Amino acid sequence: MSDFKQSGTIVTFPRLRPRDEAQREKELVTHARRTPLALIIPCLVSELEQPALAGMVARLAGTPYLDTAVISLDRADAAGYARALEYFRALRLRTMVVWNDAEPVAAIIREIEMAVLNLGPRGKGRAVWVALGAVIAEERAEAVAFLDADVVTFERSLLTNLVYPILHPALDFDYAKGYYARYSDRLHGRVTRLMVRPLLQALLNTVGHHPYLEYVDSFRYPLSGEFAVHATLLRRLRIPSDWGLE
């Protein structure tokens, strides 16, 4: 999955050669003046105890091209929310912590469900959906990136490379999804290998040529939680609120 072959209906950018990270960030700072970037990280309060999130916060701290970090916090009581506020000060960025267990948020959810639609069970999808609503309502960000809170090997270059095609005005991309090679003595990506790929192939064999199925099948890591979207596309998408995997 780490080769340079272009297949399917999307463009795949491998890391062909290393570049000066500082220079790339400097370019993004310039582009972000025109296209402000928000970063959404959904997380459980229990993840504040994990080294993965601590490492991510340390590496994201002071990211110069980031306008706003939005933390969608789940399963937290008042003490957990207060701890999260203090914890994410280390980002040294404009930061919004959305407390999904707070009564005002619950009241908004109830109002939506009574007036419009059933949002389904709580989970990662709901956390992302609520955070997206907050970002769109602010009308401040013109691009949004998403990261999982448990990326043990996270480096800031992952975010830089992810958002570069979205923020660079000459590249004209509206959506980017991350993928990466994992080298170890274990087989990773069991859900993708054992369920997603066979399911997509079965659907293609049954339905035949279908643009959407071929589009999804083109991604190296279709379940990757790292992706970025331009706001013009984001506002047009009907994003569900009840998913558990991407």
Briefly describe each language-model feature range:
Residues 1-62:
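N-proximal low-complexity "stem/linker" segments adjacent to membrane-targeting elements
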Residues 187-246:
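Conserved catalytic loops of nucleotide-sugar-dependent glycosyltransferases that act on lipid-linked
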Residues 48-52, 120-128, 155, 191-195:
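Phosphate/oxyanion-binding active-site loops and adjacent basic polyanion-contact surfaces
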